[in-house]
A protein has these predicted regions:
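Catalytic alpha/beta active-site cores
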Residues: 1-146, 151-152, 170, 179-183, ...
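Flexible, glycine-rich loop/tail regions that form catalytic "lids" or insertion modules at the edges
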Residues: 240-243, 247-412
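A short, flexible low-complexity segment enriched in Lys/Arg and Gly/Pro that occurs
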Residues: 33, 64-74, 187-195, 362-375
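Active-site capping/gating regions of soluble enzymes
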Residues: 75, 97, 113-122, 129, ...
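A short glycine/serine-rich beta->alpha loop
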Residues: 1, 104-107, 190-195, 226-228, ...
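Alpha-helix initiation/capping motif
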Residues: 43, 54, 68, 132, ...
Length: 412
């Protein structure tokens, strides 16, 4: 998806600017060139974070694609190559995402199969560029949705099992590379506009199984997501769900409390088998990119989404307060605050952008030209981006890259 490489370059520059400002405050002078390079190297090796930048799930589920798939994959490889050369080891170069695939309608099996197969596609792509598996595998992270289906209670352990086996046996990766790290966000799709207060109950259950399945990090959705961008009050309630589970709920103090339970072990084997079967279906269509050309993933997501909606509307999938156990008093009028930017906020942003353009009017054209030339010569685009963002805006860079990288066109 378009902005992440550029936003990441902004982020790295912000981290570096903070350290340079600190050096000047501590020493009362500008750093020498040698000192600047040492500060830059230390900053890049220390900074922590995650950038999503997953073009494959964009095509399959989220649809915010702006560059051609080939060019987007090249930029992802450029980011990881930059990370390897600059020892950026605490930052995740991609969050390989199943969340958006699930939110678009995929069931938990398809979510996991598509996400892991996308992950292996990135591995093959980076290996083809000459990177060593243990230099980049620890920089990969995953992002899953947790819904109401029982399969979600084992999605993490199945992902870790499949990933570890492939990393060890196929790619000869070390132990650190075999460890799959993943973030879970509770399912926004499972939250409903009817009797919204019930949504906190759904989110609590989803959060609980995510924690029991040893997720590395967790996002709990706000109850009013079905209607608006969450308010301050609803965000506090969502945060309280995590805090109560982690601070008050005693069983959560024990890792993996469901380990060894018959249903968990049985589900783990069944889900793994189903995911491996999906791998075969993808492989028979020429792998992930070959399957994308025929719309295989998108078609499957749409079929599963339609199946869910049918069951929701005919009542065969019970949703309390939506299609069963309806409130006898009817829907109460709910006053929900809709989140909107004020006119002052909009004008302030436009004014700051215009000021940035004016200040860098002399330097921007040469950096945009250098970016284009780097793409034409098949150089590392991200290495140039890190400097170009000091003078060029997101819109200027995107427009320039369209000219040489191509815009996204869906295969019909």
């Amino acid at each position: 998806n378009g902005p992440p490489p550029i936003i990441l370059a902004f982020f790295f520059n912000t981290a570096l600017d903070q350290q340079i400002t600190k050096f000047k405050a501590d020493n009362g002078r500008e750093p020498t060139e040698d000192e600047y390079q040492k500060i830059k190297a230390w900053t890049l090796s220390t900074v922590r974070g995650t950038v999503q930048a997953d073009i494959l799930k964009e095509d399959q589920g989220q649809n915010t694609c702006i560059f051609s798939t080939e060019f987007a994959l090249k930029m992802m490889g450029d980011i990881q190559e930059f990370f390897v050369h600059n020892q950026v080891q605490n930052f995740y170069s991609v969050s390989i995402s199943g969340y958006h695939i699930a939110e678009a309608g995929a069931n938990p099996i398809s979510q996991l199969a598509f996400t892991l197969s996308n992950g292996f596609t990135y591995v093959e792509s980076y290996l083809a560029r000459g990177m060593h598996i243990d230099d980049f595998a620890p920089n990969l992270s995953f992002f899953f949705s947790n819904g109401m289906d029982p399969e979600y209670s084992v999605i993490g352990r199945v992902a870790r099992r499949i990933w570890a086996v492939a990393m060890k046996n196929k790619y000869g990766a070390n132990e650190r590379s075999q460890k799959l790290k993943y973030h879970v966000q509770t399912s926004g799709r499972s939250l409903h506009a009817q009797e919204m207060d019930f949504n906190d109950i759904r989110t609590t259950l989803q959060a609980l199984i995510a924690i029991y399945d040893n997720c590395n990090s967790l996002h709990t959705n706000a109850y009013d997501e079905a209607i608006t961008t969450p308010t301050e009050e609803s965000v506090r309630r969502a945060m309280a769900i995590q805090l109560i589970i982690n601070r008050e709920w005693g069983l959560a103090k024990n890792e993996n409390p469901n380990q060894g339970a018959f249903i968990i072990d049985e589900l783990t084997d069944l889900v793994e088998e189903a995911v491996l079967k999906e791998f075969e279906a993808i492989s028979s269509r020429g792998g992930v990119l070959g399957a994308m050309e025929t719309g295989f993933q998108r078609g499957k997501i749409q079929e599963e989404s339609l199946y869910y909606e049918h069951k929701k509307h005919d009542g065969s999938y019970p949703i309390i307060g939506v299609n069963t156990f309806l409130n006898p008093k009817g829907m109460a009028q709910q006053d929900i605050e809709l989140a909107r930017s004020s006119e002052d906020e909009k004008q302030s942003q436009l004014a700051r952008l215009a000021d940035f353009h004016a200040r860098n009017a002399a330097e921007a054209p040469q950096w945009l030209a250098k970016l284009k030339q780097t793409v034409i010569e098949n150089g590392n685009v991200f290495a140039v981006l890190v400097d170009a963002v000091k003078y060029c805006s997101l819109g200027q860079i995107t427009t320039a890259l369209y000219d040489v990288g191509g815009q996204y066109r869906r295969s019909m």
